[in-house]
Amino acid sequence: MNTMNNMHLYADSLGIHPADHYPTMNEIETTDNTYPRYTSPPHPSILHHPQAPEPAPPRAQTAHPPAWALTSQSGYQMNEPSLSLTPEHRPAAGPPNGPNLNHDSDPRRPARRQQPCGVGTTRPLPGCPGQGQEPSRRRTTFTDSISNPDSTIRCWDHGCEGRKFSSVGNYRRHLREKNGQAKMHPCPDCGRVFTRSTARNFHRQSGTCGLIPSQLMLQMGMGMQLQVQMQPVSQHSLASGHPPAFNLAPPVLLEPLADWSEPSQMDLYAASGVVFD
């Protein structure tokens, strides 16, 4: 204690204030029956150091990831639900544009298709214009004839005036003939041109090859007359069961037996007793 008092007196004589003197860690007051006690004040750096903020508690995991995480993922990864989410926090899957009113809730029933206008409808529909009106009359085209086999195929080109055809092949051949694209089949004997090989072969086999049109018409008329004459005889022979008693020969063209020139007329008159002056 005397030593401490002496040190204070020495400091006062030098003009040093006791507050400016900070004792070191070695200056310790000790008493009997007590523990050592530090008398030096705390360090100024400890007094003026700002207190560090307490760490924030961890945030609870949300059900939706941040926006930057969604943009970095691919399309199929964005559609998949997060595996870390519990079932009760997962969003319910639903249609992107709201509920579909046209879809039937029963999966066992097939989906209904919207029927187009004019197909299988007998009553006029409000959304279909022109329904319930009388259809306009129009000519049947080749496309309509193909789609409807029961309809008659006609050609309405110039000069045909609705000519009928029994099949599509005949109609196409007719178009090729009009356009000059049909294959020609000439007769090697008379040079007559046919558009069908069957017509050319019939022409050669029937004996009409080499005849002029007037002779051909005469032969055709004779054939028709022969058929008319033979028809009742054949019916009578079939009814009686006996063949006809005579054979019918084709008619023969009679050539003129006399020359009707002027001298022949004079001889005819002289033979009858007529005398001319």
Swiss-Prot record:
BP GO annotations: regulation of translation
Compartment list: Nucleus
Top-level taxon of the source organism: Eukaryota
Main subcellular location: nucleus
Keywords from the UniProt entry: Metal-binding, Nucleus, Translation regulation, Zinc, Zinc-finger
Record's compositionally biased regions (Polar residues): 27-37
GO molecular function, one term: zinc ion binding
A cellular component term, taken from the record's GO annotations: nucleus
Region (Disordered): 23-66, 78-146
C2H2-type zinc-finger residues: 185-208
Function comment: C2H2-type zinc-finger transcription factor that controls the expression of the nonribosomal peptide synthases inpA and inpB, as well as of the other inp cluster-associated genes. Also mediates the expression of the asperfuranone biosynthesis gene cluster by binding to the afoA promoter. Probably recognizes the 5'-CT/C/AAAAGGAT/AT/GG/CA-3' motif in the promoters of teget genes.
Protein name from the UniProt record: C2H2-type zinc-finger transcription factor
Organism name: Emericella nidulans (strain FGSC A4 / ATCC 38163 / CBS 112.46 / NRRL 194 / M139) (Aspergillus nidulans)
